[in-house]
UniProtKB/Swiss-Prot annotation:
Family note: Belongs to the RecF family.
Disulfide bonds: none
Name of the protein: DNA replication and repair protein RecF
The keyword Oxidoreductase belongs to this UniProt entry's keyword annotation: no
GO-annotated cellular components: cytoplasm
Listed CDD domains: ABC_RecF
Entry keywords, A to Z: ATP-binding, Cytoplasm, DNA damage, DNA repair, DNA replication, DNA-binding, Nucleotide-binding, SOS response
Record GO terms (molecular function): ATP binding; single-stranded DNA binding
UniProt-listed PROSITE patterns: RECF_1, RECF_2
The protein's role, per its UniProt record: The RecF protein is involved in DNA metabolism; it is required for DNA replication and normal SOS inducibility. RecF binds preferentially to single-stranded, linear DNA. It also seems to bind ATP.
Organism: Shouchella clausii (strain KSM-K16)
Amino acid sequence: MIIHTLELSSYRNYSKTAVVFGEKINVFVGENAQGKTNLLEAIYVVALAKSHRTQKDKEMIGFEEPFARIHAKAEKRTGEVELDIILSAKGKKGKINGLEQRRLSDYVGTLNVVMFAPEDLDLVKGSPQVRRRFIDMELGQISPVYLNSLSLYGKILKQRNVLLKNMQQKRSQNYAMVDVLTEQLIDKAAFVMKKRAEFISRLEEWATPIHQSISRGKEMLTLSYIPSIEVSDIENMSKIKEDLYKAYETKRETEVRRGTTLFGPHRDDVSFSVNGLDVQSYGSQGQQRTTALSVKLAEIDLIYAEIGDYPILLLDDVLSELDNYRQSHLLEAIQARVQTFVTTTSTSGLDDSVLAEACLFSVDQGTVKRLE
């Protein structure tokens, strides 16, 4: 898939901007704080209806502006498509070919992107929340059913936590309602956990050989989904539900005392191991970076395998974080298959093969210009 044009209105430091992109590699050059990352973020938002940098939509709306709009014209294997995201204080709306979508989960997945930013190097060494968010964003864009179930899980979880907090503070002792919400929560939780485990298993199929190649055959990467409770069979929905019921039943009084839900997908994690050793605890910085790079490249292949179209790749100031060997592996992996967007403060750190195929743009104080 390819984005041909992007139009921004009142988006961060872009008052009104339109950019026409090249079909292969697009490089945005400029000093820090000029709007390069904002540009890549806009592509990410128009695809996934969420930012990779903030959870507050108002931060993306221009100063004292009522709303921001991102409009993209793209081409997929199935044909051309126009996408709109409108951000306002009232929320956000997504349109496909001018038609507003009833739910954002119906919108997400029309355009697929893979983002690789410096903070993604924290995928391995960061908190479990970072890894859960990674799964949710990547799996969500290829499975609307997963995204919808995750959203419903979040709503039920919020209700249950409010009730547990009230019970902790003696404002309510409604155990019957806790049981009702627990049953609803388990139904969604089991589906989310099963789909996440399947996704990690699929991702491992692609990431392991990539990691072997980058490490010159010296390292074997394995990925594991780690539920917050002991699950006898993560591939079996009924077994997951049974194990969740047991956990909630055993710890119900503890949850009331703590005023919060102690188990479920919102507390699960992913582990990365190299040659049997946990990379987060025992891996070198080089191994952690190779693992993050392998996982990101695996995403590209997994999305292609799922939908038959390559995603768009966003490289936000990340090439400078990789040595020449890892950089060359990244560039070799994308070749001419993937439309790529790169931000950098200088072209001096970029491989000559990149510059030979790239469309170059300067970014200065929210103004984007094509360099001939």
